[in-house]
Amino acid sequence: MTYVLALTGGIATGKSTADQFFKNKNIPVVDCDQIAHDLMKPKNASWQAIKDNFGTEYLNSDQTINRKKLGQLVFSDPTALNKLNQLTHPLIFDKTIQKIKMYQDKDIVILDAPVYFESNLDKKKIANGVLVITLPEATQINRLKQRNNLTDEEAKMRIKSQMPLNKKAQMADFVIANTGTIEELENKLEQLLIKIKEEG
C-alpha cells in the first residue's frame, strides 16, 4: 500500500527544499500549490469561480488572474480569504485525489499541502502521516521578504493568514525544525524516510 506523507508548514519554512530532496530520491510529489495555480488558469474551474464571485477587476488584460491584487485583498481581509478558500479548496481536493491515485504503485507519495490543516484535509484522512517543517518566525519573515519582495508588514500578514506553526506542529505526526543548513534539513528528512520505511 502506498504511504501518503503530507508535507506542510508555513510560508518560506523550507517545503520547496524538502520537495526537491524527495524528487531527487525518485519519490513523487503531488504539489497542491501547483494544482491550485493550474486551476486558476483562464477558463479553468477556480478561474471561473473567482471571476464570478470577485469580479473582473481581479483579472489582467490577458484574462489571467491578477494574483498580486487578489493576494492584497485576501491577505488583509479574513472574510475574503475564507470566501476564496470555500470556492477553491473543494476543486483542489478533487484534483489532488486524482493525482495521488496515479502513484498507487509507489511505496511513498509526498503531498505538498501548505494549508493542509486550514483546508481540513486532515479531516478527510487523505494522508497516512503529516510532516510539519518549522522555522523561527523572524527567519520566516526575512525569507519571505527576500523571496517575494514584500515589506515587513506584508510578510507578517501572509504568515498570520495561516495557522500558527506551533499549532500545526502539535497536530503533526512528525516535526522537523529547519534551523540549520540545507544539508542538515536533508539529513533529518533522510532519517524520517528510514523511520517510515521501518514502520511501514
Curated annotation (Swiss-Prot):
Its main location: cytoplasm. Pathway: Cofactor biosynthesis; coenzyme A biosynthesis; CoA from (R)-pantothenate: step 5/5. Keywords: ATP-binding, Coenzyme A biosynthesis, Cytoplasm, Kinase, Nucleotide-binding, Transferase. One of its GO terms (molecular function) is ATP binding. Residues 4-200 form the DPCK domain. ATP binds at residues 12-17. It catalyses: 3'-dephospho-CoA + ATP = ADP + CoA + H(+). GO terms for biological process: coenzyme A biosynthetic process. It is found in: Cytoplasm. InterPro entries: Depp_CoAkinase, P-loop_NTPase. The keyword Kinase applies. GO terms for cellular component: cytoplasm. PROSITE patterns: DPCK. The keyword Kinase applies. Its EC number is 2.7.1.24. It is an enzyme of class 2 (transferase). PANTHER family: BIFUNCTIONAL COENZYME A SYNTHASE-RELATED, DEPHOSPHO-COA KINASE-RELATED. Belongs to the CoaE family. Catalyzes the phosphorylation of the 3'-hydroxyl group of dephosphocoenzyme A to form coenzyme A. This is Dephospho-CoA kinase.
